[in-house]
Amino acid sequence: MHILLTEYVVRVYTQRIVAAMESKLTLLGLLSAGPGHGYDLKRSWDHWFAASKPLAYGQVYATLARLVRDGLITQVETEPGAGPERKRYEVTDTGRQSVEQWLLTPVTPAGDVQADIFAKTVIALMLDDDAGRLLDLQRAEHMARMRELTRLKQDGDLRTVLLADHALFHIEADLRWMETTAARLNELREEVRS
């Protein structure tokens, strides 16, 4: 059960973290930690991000080729292997500057969950359905997720705890939004009908 919850948290809740994440800059950031092969980057990506944003080996190598082309990384050596040659890459000064700029550029907060709930609420009101019931059902779903995440944090490693905290804070914001919206349903109903 604990493993399933961990996989659930990593898969579902990190989607908000990496949904808009650029693979190119993320791989460049991973490579900034030190020179490495495409295989090393893929392993690092899989460890941190694959549950919510899988990346195929082909994407890794295609991205590395673009990074070389753009002057953000350089190939520093080639090692013979059992299969294809293993190319080792290193970030250039321009690449480091790109990573620094990327790290200092704030990510636009995603409102996807609220937008979906809002759309359902408006449509429910348009159809004279019970929008309050819809919000109650959504609130119950959010509360169930909060309980799962809270349990998960008890035995989780630091990565799991941090991801669970991130998800919990987003869920809390969603719940506040639902409460505010529920309190304004009559007002919204009038606006929808006008």
Regions found by a protein language model. Give the residues of each.
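Secondary-structure edge/capping motif, primarily at the C-terminal ends of alpha-helices
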Residues: 125, 149-156, 185, 189
